């Protein structure tokens, strides 16, 4: 009986944790979803961004106390501007979706919203992690050996 309880708790923690992509699996998925070269942004740059924003974790969240917004999902898309979480004051919801959609293992909605973000004048510079960890750096390592 104890073994079943422990197994249940382990399975529950896996469900809450979400999908953490393997590097090459994510690279192939992003390529398939049209991210390689989207708005002139290389697949390696998208991979670097995802690495430093979420560690490739679809369920990553980060609360920002200053403006009471939250960053969601593999790209850490912010509820102040891009999605609706029902609790961020003055939210814009420019991607026209619920923030919970950004936490799914299927990242199609997250990719569509990230594409919307980079259509704004700031482009990929909207992400602080990209500016701090990827901009003007050799990011080839994020796709190396993935065959993409």
From Swiss-Prot:
Identify the enzyme class: hydrolase
Enzyme Commission code: 3.2.1.17
Name one matching Pfam family. Answer: Lys
Q: Name one GO biological process term.
A: defense response to Gram-negative bacterium
Disulfide connectivity?
A: 24-146, 48-134, 83-99, 95-113
Q: Per its UniProt record, what CDD domains does this chain match?
A: LYZ_C
Q: Where is the active site?
A: 53, 71
Which SUPFAM superfamilies does this entry report, sorted A to Z? Lysozyme-like (SSF53955)
* Reaction equation(s) it catalyzes: Hydrolysis of (1->4)-beta-linkages between N-acetylmuramic acid and N-acetyl-D-glucosamine residues in a peptidoglycan and between N-acetyl-D-glucosamine residues in chitodextrins
Q: Which GO terms describe its molecular function?
A: lysozyme activity
Which positions carry the signal peptide feature in this UniProt record? 1-18
Q: Name the UniProt key words of this record, in alphabetical order.
A: Antimicrobial, Bacteriolytic enzyme, Disulfide bond, Glycosidase, Hydrolase, Signal
Q: PROSITE patterns annotated for this entry?
A: GLYCOSYL_HYDROL_F22_1, GLYCOSYL_HYDROL_F22_2
Occurrences of domain C-type lysozyme (ranges): 19-148
Family membership noted in the UniProt record: Belongs to the glycosyl hydrolase 22 family.
Quaternary structure annotation from Swiss-Prot or TrEMBL? Monomer.
Remaining remarks = Lysozyme C is capable of both hydrolysis and transglycosylation; it also shows a slight esterase activity. It acts rapidly on both peptide-substituted and unsubstituted peptidoglycan, and slowly on chitin oligosaccharides.
Its biological purpose:
Lysozymes have primarily a bacteriolytic function; those in tissues and body fluids are associated with the monocyte-macrophage system and enhance the activity of immunoagents.
* Protein name, entry field: Lysozyme C
Please give the organism: Gorilla gorilla gorilla (Western lowland gorilla)
The record's gene field reads: LYZ
